[in-house]
Amino acid sequence: MKTFLIDYRRPDGREDFKVVEADTAAQAVEIFRAAGCDGWSGFLFQEFDIMAVSERVG
């Protein structure tokens, strides 16, 4: 499993993100859509390293 970060814009204009665990980018997008986010605009960041970011943040 890989960790994917999806940065997206909600229909009301607010920006948000979702972290998804999946084997492939295509599966991550399907999980995102199945969560009720189909049709929302967004960007997919592959293999996001959460541990590296949390260590840098604090």
Give the ranges of each region predicted by the language model.
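Short, mixed-charge low-complexity intrinsically disordered segments
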Residues: 35-58
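Short aromatic-glycine-(Arg/Gly/Cys) micro-motifs in beta-strand/loop hairpins
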Residues: 1-15
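Hydrophobic aliphatic residue packing
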Residues: 6, 19-20, 50-53
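A short, exposed loop/beta-hairpin motif centered on an aromatic-Gly-Thr core
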Residues: 14-24
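Short, composition-biased linear "edge" segments at structural boundaries
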Residues: 31-32
